[in-house]
UniProtKB/Swiss-Prot annotation:
Tree of life domain: Bacteria
Job of this protein: NDH-1 shuttles electrons from NADH, via FMN and iron-sulfur (Fe-S) centers, to quinones in the respiratory chain. The immediate electron acceptor for the enzyme in this species is believed to be ubiquinone. Couples the redox reaction to proton translocation (for every two electrons transferred, four hydrogen ions are translocated across the cytoplasmic membrane), and thus conserves the redox energy in a proton gradient.
Record keywords, A-Z: Cell inner membrane, Cell membrane, Membrane, NAD, Quinone, Translocase, Transport, Ubiquinone
NCBIfam families the UniProt entry points to: NuoD, PRK06075.1
Catalytic activity line of the entry: a quinone + NADH + 5 H(+)(in) = a quinol + NAD(+) + 4 H(+)(out)
Organism: Rhizobium etli (strain ATCC 51251 / DSM 11541 / JCM 21823 / NBRC 15573 / CFN 42)
Name of the protein in question: NADH-quinone oxidoreductase subunit D 2
Encoding gene per record: nuoD2
Family: Belongs to the complex I 49 kDa subunit family.
Oligomeric form and interacting partners: NDH-1 is composed of 14 different subunits. Subunits NuoB, C, D, E, F, and G constitute the peripheral sector of the complex.
Amino acid sequence: MTEVTELSRPEGEALNTREVLLNLGPQHPSTHGVLRLVLELDGEFVERVDPHIGYLHRGTEKLAESFTYTQIFPLTDRLDYLCPPSNNLAFALAVEKLLGIEAPIRAQYIRVMMAELARISGHLLITGALPMDLGAMTALLYVMREREMIMDLLEMITGARMHTSFCRVGGVREDLPDGFFPKIREFCDIFPNRIRDYERLLEDNRVFLNRTKGIGVISAEDAVDLGLSGPNLRASGVDWDIRRDEPYEIYDRLDFNVITRDEGDCYARWRCRVDEMRESMRIIEQCIDQMPEGPFQIDMPTIAFPLDKDRVHCSMEALIQHFDLSAYGFKVPKGEVYSAIEAPKGELGFYIISDGSPKPFRMKVRAPSFVNLQALFGVTNARYLADMIAVLGSLDPVMAEVDK
């Protein structure tokens, strides 16, 4: 019988190891071809992560300098393209702040209702996509069923499923269509039970819990220092939501809770989004019940298109108004402004400098995904390589918003 001996090295000689650089993306299922992470590995541990961005850069901020304020709305659709009504709203509020105007109350209710539908749509996707990135595909198939219902509602209102471009400075493009309220009430009746389905699928799933609980922890102090916002901030125990703390539109008339958790890990960030969908449903139901009659757009010929489109065909004044706004846009007083909303990913803000012309002199977008992505620096120290996908997925960045 052959004697088994232990392999050994001379006493005092260290094991020869070296750090490895690994490219995660851009050709990787979790980064969708638009994000490259250069990982510095010590064995299976991630010592450092260096995000390389810009694969989806389209020059949104520079393009805005050549567009009228109305023409910029389609550009905002393509920031967080999962939730375009929120992007439209943030930009519209910034311009209205410069003009010193407010949209009619009915328009504000419509805007808020659409923004909350967009929030649910965005949260639904990450509710199913995070488990899918970790190997559990079933949840994604469930959430896409409800997300399709939201797409149908948005298409019913705007005529488009994704790039809605529905907001306008001073209101919205048109009023809600006939038959909309029965459709959205049907969704409101169905959706709470569907959320419970997602929870039953995942909240007791040991594999999902082991891959997310205690992984990628961000403390409250680090979250504030990094400038995180949205669910990524609230999952670390920081109770901050612009809708409640700096209310805009009609949020101060609505009753809803701000969801927070203390763990700060991947599971807490996932759980915050699931619970926020319930609060968004409460907001939508209140908007339906409180929806007032009235105009959907401000009645200012120098800013808004004619409320009655038929007047364009029989009134010279209305035709001139329509032509001027379409061809040349409206002038905004000189000044600068910053306005932010609580978008699904966090604080989405627009900083605009006006020189008094129909086009902005400078526009800066404060994109929450851009800020949230830097949290990768703080949560990956001494974590396994296999955890990187869970950490990235739980931060829920949209690269179109990062690269602009």
